[in-house]
Amino acid sequence: MQTQNLYLNIITMEIDKKKSFNSKIWHILWSTILFISPTGTWAQNDSVKTPQNEIDFSINLLAHGEACGGGLPKGAEENKSRFLLGRMRIIADYKRPGLQVHAVTQNLAIWGMKGNQAFNLYEGWAKISSKNGFFAQVGRVALSYDDERIIGTNDFATAALSHDLIRVGYEGHGHQAHAIFCYNQNDNNIYNNTYYDDGAQYYKTMQTLWYHYDFPKFPLGVSLLFMNIGMQAGKINPKEWDYDTNPARTEYQQMFGGYINYHPKHLTLEASYYRQTGKQVAISMNASDIRAWMASVKATITPTDRYGFIVGYDHLSGDDYMPVPYGGDIGLIRHDVVKGFSPLYGSRTKFYGILDFFYESAYINGFTPGLQNVFIGAFGDPVKKLSCSFTYHYLATATALTNLNRTLGHSIEIGADYRFSKDITLSIGYTQMFGTETMCRLKQDESNKNGRWGWFSLVISPTVFSTKW
């Protein structure tokens, strides 16, 4: 019996040893698997390269319609107009680390018009960038800085704005510093090859410095801007140049100022101030000194994400008298200093009323009495995908006028946007201008007393192809 018990104990010990041995084997095996598995996964991730190249093709189709009456210095038979306009953009993008290439072709035409009203390369540029924030860009670029008051795309004008340029800069750690260099030439001009009067923008040369800083842990952004713009002076036809009194030449004007954006919760305060100096030129006229300025302030209050309110004031300096052509003109007062501020290349319809009676559509004889714009409005999203806005403008000249009141009129704007999907949006709007006798005298058109304008825009912008490798 003892022998049998001893035998059973030996067998039990052997079984326990085997179990212990097997347990150790399984422990070692699982440890190895757990150790190898992540390593294998990491090795696999290392072997599969992250896509370095990306190509995107997209289409931007704009169908735009307008019906207007009044607002422009035209005869009674041209006082009303209705038309439909189409704009097609084909957009191509290529990206890889350190390089981006962007091209946009644009076709613009009025429906029913034979041929194309405009077909051009709206944008075409290449941008080289480094990991430390420095970059260089060359080509035709649609520029947009700050609130677009001085430099913007002005996209509502359908043809929009772009510039042929070289841009270098730095972006990082809250700092943005850009330097822009432009030089335009007209290859059809074989006489001295200096005059430039057609192209992306109407200037000979432009140099721009822009700096922006976002304060850390504080809702404040500050920008500084300096521009030096060379405009061609003299007659367009070189054969008519008078080298003794009015030769072809380039005159320069400067723009400098700043923009501030303070945006705590539920409130955004914006302010800007700019000055213009240098020389103002016009065809067949001597250059005049420029002493102009503008200032603006705007508050946007958003109690919730669903609605908000705006209130603000713009002041653009103006001339006291009409300009006089070179050589003088009997009965007109000669003045050598231009005080009328020019917004240059900004998105003008964004600030002084979407119809923009004052800068897109100039006064008679180019007279610029300046502008005061007091505005108040509201915006909101009453239902999903629908945005609505209402804005009132009180408009007046900046300078006092002889025998006329400064008040130009009152403008009411109503707008709505409906987003059918992420790439389909319908916008509609209506503007009513209640002009005064001052507006009529400056525009020389009685129809400005009751200018009205309704419009719609349908934008379809799908991405048709996208790939990475």
Where do the protein language model's features map onto the residues?
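Bacterial Sec-dependent N-terminal signal peptides
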Residues: 1-44
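Beta-barrel outer-membrane channel/assembly domains of diderm bacteria
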Residues: 43-139, 166-170, 251, 260-272, ...
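Flexible, solvent-exposed coil segments and beta strand-coil junctions
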Residues: 68-71, 105, 142-149, 180-192, ...
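Outer-membrane beta-barrel translocator domains and adjoining extracellular loop/strand segments
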Residues: 69-76, 113-119, 148-155, 189-198, ...
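Short Gly/Pro-enriched turn/cap motifs at secondary-structure boundaries
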Residues: 80-81, 156-158, 199-201, 248-249, ...
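Outer membrane beta-barrel
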Residues: 82-188, 208, 212-216, 221, ...
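Internal metal/ion-chelating core segments
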Residues: 176-272
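Extracellular/periplasmic loop regions
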Residues: 276-377, 441
